[in-house]
Design a protein with these regions (language model features):
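N-terminal leader segment of winged-helix/HTH proteins
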Residues: 1-46
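Charged, amphipathic alpha-helical coiled-coil/dimerization segments
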Residues: 2-11, 87-147
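Active-site phosphate/pyrophosphate-handling residues
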Residues: 22, 54, 143
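Short amphipathic alpha-helical segments with heptad-repeat character
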Residues: 24, 28, 32, 76, ...
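Structural signal for well-ordered, non-membrane alpha-helices
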Residues: 31, 35, 39, 123, ...
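N-terminal helix-turn-helix DNA-binding core of bacterial DNA-binding proteins
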Residues: 32, 36-78, 92, 165
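Exposed, interaction-prone assembly regions rather than primary DNA-binding/catalytic cores
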Residues: 143-165
């Protein structure tokens, strides 16, 4: 049995006049499989959720800290979702909160030293897991897929969602 048939898709994979829908379903299948594996590995090996990893990753990229609004925009989720995750990381000692010097209504979340140390290990494992999952795809093909997905991203940005005449 080939590795392609071991992962079930929502369609048979054949391309016809519904190429766009089938492409979207294949992208969804791949994304879902990768996400499920990451969730399971983070939970099993570190006792942490993927959303906590995502928040820590965003804060690691912004050592100056981020507001809940900035975090929600960066992670493409609601502020309510981010707040719960940040509160859990705060309880665990991985994140600190401080009042914003420019906006009294906002708080700035930052990784603590313990949070940075924890994230370093998480990020190394995350990188290794992704590399292992994509190891069967030659580097040149990964680069080509990345470039093609950039074209898709541009197409998505151009679609306003309004009905076309």
């Amino acid at each position: 049995m080939s590795s392609e048939t071991m992962i079930r898709e929502k369609h048979d994979g054949a391309l016809d006049d519904r190429t766009s829908v089938r492409l979207w379903l294949r992208l969804l299948t791949c994304t879902t499989v990768i996400e499920k594996r990451l969730k399971r590995r983070f939970a099993d090996q570190y006792g942490i959720t993927l959303p906590r990893f995502d928040v820590m990753a965003a804060l690691d990229r912004h050592p100056e800290g981020m507001t809940m609004g900035q975090l929600s925009q960066a992670l493409l989720v609601s502020s309510g979702n981010v707040t719960g995750v940040v509160q859990a990381l705060l309880r665990e000692g991985y994140v600190s909160m401080a009042a914003s010097p420019t906006d009294g209504r906002a708080s700035i979340a930052r990784l603590t030293e313990a949070g940075r140390d924890c994230f370093t290990g998480l990020a190394e494992s995350h990188h290794e897991w992704i590399e292992a999952m994509l190891a069967g795809v030659p580097r040149e093909e990964r680069v080509a897929m990345y470039d093609l997905l950039g074209v898709l991203k541009t197409s998505l940005a151009a679609d306003t969602g309004e009905e076309q005449p």
